Amino acid sequence: MKRQEIDHIPFDLTVEILTRLPAKSLMKFKCVSKLWSSIIHNQSFIDSFYSISSTRPRFIVAFSNGSFPSDKEKRLFIFSSSHEGHESSSSVITNLDTTIPSLTVSNNLASRCISVNGFIACSLYTRFTICNPSTRQVIVLPILPSGRAPDMRSTCIGYDPVDDQFKALALISSCIPNKDSTVEHLVLTLKGDKKNYSWRQIQGNNNIPPYSPVTMRVCINGVVYYGAWTPRQSMNAVIVCFDVRSEKITFIKTPKDVVRWCNDSILMEYKGKLASIVRNRYSRFDTFDLWVLEDIEKQEWSKQTCEIPLSVWDSVENFNMSFPGINKFGEIILAPTCLSGYHLRSFYIFYYHVETKKIRRVRLEGIADDENFRRCYGIGSGQCNVFISPEHVETIRFL
């Protein structure tokens, strides 16, 4: 009796099945055959995979292992998990996705670690690194050119959905006492041969008044936003808007309380609109203000004060908290800015629902709560700064 031949899976069905698989599995399956490799590298497949991934975003936690005298000992760990359930209290298991050697981050204007369209961008003063946890591609951008000392440097990444283009934006602001701050704007287009990557001056923005950038950046629908004071001496608050596609810079007038220094005001997207969460660093963490840009043309803002019972923080060592973003349930996420130093403690994040005013706590299991892991990588011997991206979308794209 002849063995019946197994029918081949139709090509379209093969493609459909592959789009449903995890990104890491696809990276392994490229070695199965030339056909599968060509499918996975096809731009149409990459776009389809990203579209499906956007319906199931992942929760990303990145943290460094403290301060070491040698760069060889420094590490940046990137953990991820599927989105947590909408419950009053729960725990979520996280998995280590990627480890980036010789890289660390800190909590200041010159350092940041954020997710933009599937890529994690990490900046630390003159060094700017971009990685894809799914493909494990790591790109170290050229060091920023020397400026006139003293100055402050910061970098971020923006994405233009029209041209499907990533660009890095660098700000070099002068820090001369008793003078208005001048800012040099540099751009690097993430396209082509990486050996030819270079920073270039933004053209056509000669009429920009002096200003001092004072907040972290956020990219929403092709525009990078950040808070600033202009002119520096009178400290008028504005939101600076950098259009990634046109590379034009404009200002949005804001109430003074919308923009504060560094982590005291955090910009984010709230229900499709630009928002700023503002807290008072000199008081106990029981209230914060949510400012929302309701009409960008009229430059009109709304304000809502949110209250949190102090008993919520019983499981947290200190009140040094940050606001990483908002989830699909409309909950504002609150999280510690660093890991527990020398003590093996659980890592908790909190969710505050603006409309119902309810707050819930979620324990993230696996975030450096293993003694062997901490000892192996030196966690606890220095400040371990934490950055969270709650809406990370996996991509198999390479830059």
From Swiss-Prot:
Q: Which domain of life is it from?
A: Eukaryota
Per its UniProt record, what InterPro entries does this chain match? Answer: F-box-assoc_dom_typ3 (IPR013187), F-box-assoc_interact_dom (IPR017451), F-box-like_dom_sf (IPR036047), F-box_dom (IPR001810)
Q: Which residues form the F-box domain?
A: 3-49
- List the GO terms this entry assigns under cellular component, sorted alphabetically: cytoplasm
Cross-referenced Pfam families:
F-box, FBA_3
Q: What is this protein called?
A: F-box protein At1g30790
Q: Which organism is it from?
A: Arabidopsis thaliana
